[in-house]
């Protein structure tokens, strides 16, 4: 493991038809951890296999819509080419629990170079989109496991934050993202970038 530290943000979105959800009704929770091990079955995609384990609770009656892993922050010098070269994954990228209870939901992974317009983010991010069916969809709570590969060895995640955002509402929640991430050859964030580590939630 090298001495670099990586700053990342993970954001999840809940489906909603409301324009605003009150703070009292939206006590959400999200937490994730990334682990790494030498790749033994997909070495053509990268020498290292990374696994993101995620738990969520939207705190409302609205189910998970999708979630984003924000990789590059304002002031950083990573570009889309850096990420395209550094990250690989299979289809589906992962799986989570679903509703009704006992079913499983698969997810597609997308590298979005222009961010997520639903919350006015224009930075590089990895989007995890559920492949829904009439028989199984993500719920208001759940757990998921997602896998990607890289030629770059793991580096500790520094000053992480995890945010759960209602896609059509005003709620933003933050929780811990721990573990490791590929030690990218670029800098995902500027040294003066804002740290969200102590912020639990905010309402715009």
Language-model segments: residues:
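A short, hydrophobic C-terminal helix/tail in secreted or cell-surface proteins
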Residues: 192-203
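Serine/threonine-rich, low-complexity intrinsically disordered segments
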Residues: 8-9, 23, 116
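Extracellular or exported targeting regions of proteins
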Residues: 27-186
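N-terminal secretory signal peptides that target proteins for export/translocation
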Residues: 1-7
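Bacterial N-terminal signal peptides
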Residues: 9-18
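Sec/Tat signal peptide C-region and signal peptidase I cleavage site
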Residues: 20-26
């Amino acid at each position: 493991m090298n001495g670099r530290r990586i700053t990342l943000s993970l954001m999840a979105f809940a489906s909603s038809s409301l324009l605003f959800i009150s703070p009292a009704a939206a006590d959400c929770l999200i937490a994730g951890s990334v682990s790494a091990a030498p790749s033994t079955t997909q070495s053509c995609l990268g020498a290292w296999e990374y696994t993101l384990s995620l738990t969520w609770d939207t705190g409302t009656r609205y189910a998970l819509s999708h979630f984003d892993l924000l990789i590059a922050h304002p002031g950083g010098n990573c570009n889309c080419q850096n990420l395209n070269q550094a990250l690989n994954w299979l289809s589906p990228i992962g799986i989570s629990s679903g509703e009704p209870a006992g079913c499983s939901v698969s997810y597609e992974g997308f590298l979005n170079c222009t961010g997520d317009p639903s919350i006015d983010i224009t930075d590089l991010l990895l989007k995890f989109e559920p492949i829904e069916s009439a028989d199984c969809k993500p719920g208001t709570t759940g757990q998921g496991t997602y896998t990607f590969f890289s030629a770059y060895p793991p580096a500790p995640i520094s000053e992480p934050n995890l945010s759960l955002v209602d896609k059509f509402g005003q709620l933003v929640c933050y929780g811990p993202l721990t573990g490791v991430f590929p030690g990218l050859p670029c800098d995902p964030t500027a040294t003066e970038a804002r740290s969200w580590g102590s912020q639990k939630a905010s309402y715009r």
